[in-house]
Every structure is written in C-alpha cells, then in structure tokens.
Regions:
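Residue-level signature of outer-membrane beta-barrel architecture
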Residues: 9, 44-48, 81-84, 93, ...
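Repeated loop/turn-to-beta-strand initiation elements of outer-membrane beta-barrel proteins
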Residues: 9, 49-55, 86-89, 138-141, ...
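Membrane-embedded beta-strand positions of outer-membrane beta-barrel proteins
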Residues: 13-15, 55-59, 91, 132, ...
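Transmembrane beta-strand segments that form the barrel wall of outer-membrane beta-barrel proteins
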Residues: 15-25, 54-65, 76, 113, ...
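Residues that define the transmembrane beta-barrel architecture of outer-membrane proteins
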Residues: 32-38, 71-76, 124-128, 135, ...
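Outer-membrane beta-barrel "beta-signal"
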Residues: 132, 268, 357, 370-384
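Detector for outer-membrane/organellar transmembrane beta-barrel domains
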Residues: 244-328
Length: 384
C-alpha cells in the first residue's frame, strides 16, 4: 500500500486597495465617478509522492464600494497534478492561457472572462477541467475535458462600463439543452522550432462570448439576457524572433449557429536596447485586428490598428510603462487609448496605474456605450 508524505504547505498571495476615478459624469443616474475596491487573493501549494503529485489553490475575493455585481469571489485554481516522465494529468479547477499577441487574445478560449474586473479581458474565472498532456520531441499535446460552463460576469446597474440595459445574469440562455452542464472539449499542440513558437488548437463547446437577447426581467423592466451558443473553433498562434523583431499572430476560424467566420490579429514588437546609451529599453508595437462579423454591433475589433510603446527601466524595482492607442479604420472618430505602469516599492509592496480613454461618436459601434467611461485607477498591492 503506497504511503504519501506531504511536504510543507507553501502559503503566498496578494491583497490590494484600488481607487478608480472616472473622468466624465456617468450616462446613468445610479453611477458614480469615484469608486474604491479591495481584493484578497490567497494561494497555497503542496507536493507529495516524491514531487510527482501536487495540489495547488488560488482564491480571489473582491469587495466593491459601488457595484454589487463586482463584489464577488472565485476559486481561480484548485487542482491536483500528477507528473510522469513524459506526461502529466490534472483534475480540478484551473486557468489556462493560450496566445501570443498584445492587444487581443482570440485563441484563448478555455477560461471565461471575469469581465467586472477590467476592460481588457485579461482576468479569468476558474474552469472545472480534466486534462492529459503528452510531452514529446515533436511538441506538447494536451487534451481538455470541460464538464461545467462558467457564465461571464457583468457590471450591475450601479457599475460603470456597462450597456444601456442591465444584463440579466440570473436568466441566461443556452443553445445546448444541457445548458451549463454541456461537456466541452479542446485539444492543443504547441512546439518550439528554433526561433519560432507555434500553437494549434481546437475547441468544441459552449461559447465563452455571449450574444444578447432583449427581454424583461422579474421586475418587468427591459434587460439583456446573455445567450451562449455552441461553437467549433480552430486556432493558430505564432511567435517568431528575428533579431530585434518579435512577430506575433493569432487567428481563428469559428462556426457559430451555422455561420462561419474568420478573425485574426497580427503584428510586431521591435526593441531598442539601451536607448540613447542609457539603461532603458523601449519597444514599439503594432498590431492589426480583423473580425469577419462585419455587421455585428457587439464586435469591437473588426478592422482596427493598435500602435503602442513599452518603456522598460531595467531597475531593481521592475519599473515599466506600456501605452497605446487602438484606431478604428472604418470610423476615424472611434478610438481608444490605454496606459499601464507599475513598479515595486520593496519586496512586499507594489504600485500600479491603469488608465483608459474611449472616443466614439458612432451609435452603431460596440464602443459607443463606453464613450463616457474614461478612467484612471491607482492600485497599491501587497504580496506575501
């Protein structure tokens, strides 16, 4: 009978206070310009069976001053991992990231977006999953079984960055008769070939990106009900190193409700090392975004160009600044801009500044609902 000896449990995590200030008055009377929130994100890890098995946990809880829907908790990760010589199996709740580009992640489809967290869609909810990975000289292959679907979070009636009608998250609609219990599955192969990194993926299941149906809620008020269709998605992501150039590309072919369309994002990042004989590095970024759903009003990245720059200070505090603008090439008066800056104060404390500006005078564009939601956010983060 095998005996399992657990190593010590490692506890880490972070907590933060965030002050967000919107630069313009809100469109709707329930909304405020200033908003304070705090979050706590504990982590734990232990290994056993001579390091061949491990259990990891990542939790998250946020309290928001204004928006009840943004006050929420989630298990980002709680999984068991068993590692063999050339294979690995996992079961539980996990987070997986696919992709290479900066401005948009098209192939990243395993986890649902925690949309109340930030406008960039980088924050994800934990996804129940069982995975099996095979590691060979010809690449790494992983099969995913996803037995339960997570619905996307949305700001409530008191929150900013939301559509004109509130989203009725209590009454979602599904194409699958199994609703959130539909068994989704995915397959991914990735490999490094010299200076090239290539990933191929396939997903079959419930779309993480909902459509919306205008309806009435329990109070007989108009609302938007999320509708989650079944989709099939084939994806490719590529990164290539060419001297000071980094070429990035992501593309998908999707079938949704008997409609096929293509979307892709691609571009480059070029690095100037030691700017003007200093310790600073500056990177220039450009990416083009295309989506074949040209008549879909809820699609933002249809025919857009992102230009940006990243300034790396190369100091002991890891200071860096990323700034950029995304221009709609179909409408000259539709664009957005962003700034992300961060630096460590000491071994435990870090500050972060995030700012977003939205400009849209086209009512038919998805970004029109954000036209008064320019904001700046200051975060003070503690790591333990």
């Amino acid at each position: 009978m095998p005996t399992f000896v657990f190593a010590d449990i490692e506890y880490t995590g972070s907590a933060a206070v965030e002050q967000r200030y919107f630069l313009q008055d809100a469109l709707y009377p329930q909304q405020e310009r200033a908003n304070l929130s705090v979050y706590f994100a504990p982590q734990a890890y232990t290994s056993f069976n001579d390091g061949n098995d491990s259990i990891s946990f990542k939790g998250f809880y946020r309290f928001d001053q204004q928006d009840e829907e943004r006050t929420h908790g989630d298990i980002r990760e709680f999984k068991w991992t068993h590692s063999g010589e050339e294979w690995e199996a996992q079961a539980g709740i996990g987070k997986v990231f696919w992709g290479q580009t900066e401005s948009l992640h098209l192939v990243d489809i395993i986890n649902q977006t925690d949309a109340v967290e930030a406008i960039d869609g980088e924050d994800k909810l934990g996804q129940p999953m069982v995975t099996f990975s095979l590691f060979k000289d010809w690449g790494n292959t992983t099969v995913f079984a996803l037995p339960y679907f997570r619905e996307r979070t949305f700001s409530g009636i008191d929150g900013r960055i939301r559509p004109a009608l509130p989203v009725d998250t209590d009454n979602p609609l599904f194409e699958s008769e199994d609703e959130e219990k539909n068994l989704d599955w995915a397959l991914r192969w990735q490999h490094t070939l010299g200076d090239w990194e290539v990933g191929l993926s396939y997903f079959d299941g419930t779309s993480r990106e909902p459509d919306f149906v205008v309806a009435t809620n329990e109070s007989s008020e108009p609302s938007l009900r999320p509708f989650y269709p079944q989709i099939q998605q084939a994806g490719i992501d590529v990164l290539a190193l060419m001297g000071g150039w980094v070429i990035k590309f992501e593309g998908v072919q999707r079938k949704v409700m008997d409609e096929d369309y293509t979307a892709f994002v691609g571009g480059f990042e070029y690095s100037f090392v030691g700017l003007f004989d200093s310790v600073y590095d500056i990177n220039w970024l450009m990416e083009y975004q295309y989506d074949g759903r040209e008549n879909q009003s809820n699609v933002i990245a249809q025919n857009d160009l992102m230009l940006g720059t990243r300034l790396v200070f190369n100091d002991i505090d890891g200071t860096q600044i990323l700034a950029g603008v995304v221009q709609d090439l179909d409408h000259s008066n539709v664009r957005s801009g962003f700034i992300e800056a961060s630096s460590r104060i000491n071994n435990h404390w870090k500050w972060r500044v995030d700012a977003y500006i939205f400009s849209s005078d086209e009512p038919t564009e998805a970004s029109y609902m954000l036209r008064r939601d320019d904001y700046a956010q200051l975060s003070l983060e503690y790591y333990f």
